[in-house]
Design a protein with these regions (language model features):
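Post-cleavage N-terminal segment of exported redox proteins
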Residues: 1-35
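Intrinsically disordered, low-complexity boundary segments flanking structured domains
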Residues: 12-15, 19, 78-79, 96-101, ...
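Electrostatic cytochrome c docking/interface patches
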Residues: 22-46, 57-68, 77
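Generic alpha-helical secondary structure signal
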Residues: 39, 75, 119-122
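C-type cytochrome heme c attachment motif
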Residues: 46-58, 94-98, 108-119, 123-126
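A generic secondary-structure signal for well-formed alpha-helical elements
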Residues: 51-59, 63, 132-135
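Structured domain cores in non-transmembrane regions
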Residues: 66-103, 107-109, 115
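Thiol/selenol-based redox catalytic cores and closely related redox-interacting motifs
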Residues: 104-146
Length: 146
């Protein structure tokens, strides 16, 4: 997988993959990702940092690598995406202790760095679009993919 495709996957769609496999009866939608749309990839990276990185790490991706791949100056990444004193050469980890996360969520949220490589881009896209309100679940939502 080329660098742009990896960045597209990270920036566009890294969200919980969990350990379970996708159900065989779930139709996977095609993810039409334009890896040449750098602005979209940059917005995806910002969304990932703002909404996912609080619980999910991306421990195999460095901030500096993301900045290089998304044509972002490192100081812009530090000013806009790094809020806890991280260094630009560090990997994207979370401060939440795994034991606390397991207590709060039932298990620690998985690292998302390699999710697209493991499950595929279409799985991620379908997963993101498959949430629905389910009052019977502890968090009030469920997903058709698993």
């Amino acid at each position: 997988m080329n660098v742009w495709k990896r960045i597209a996957v990270l920036g566009f769609s890294l969200l919980p993959s969990l350990a379970s496999a996708a159900s065989a009866d779930v139709h996977l939608e095609h993810a039409n990702i334009d890896v040449g749309n750098v602005q979209s990839l940059q917005r995806g990276a910002q969304l990932f940092h703002n909404y996912c990185l609080s619980c999910h790490s991306a421990q195999y991706m460095r901030y500096s690598r993301m900045a290089e791949d998304l044509n972002l100056p490192p100081d812009l990444v530090v000013d806009n995406l790094m809020f806890a004193g991280e260094k630009v050469g560090e990997t994207m980890t979370v401060a939440m202790p795994a034991a606390d996360a397991a207590n709060w969520f039932g298990k620690a949220p998985p690292d998302l760095t390699l999710t697209a490589r493991q499950r595929g881009v279409d799985w991620l896209y379908t997963y993101l679009k498959s949430f629905y309100v389910d009052p019977s679940k502890p968090l009030g939502v469920n997903n058709l993919v698993f």
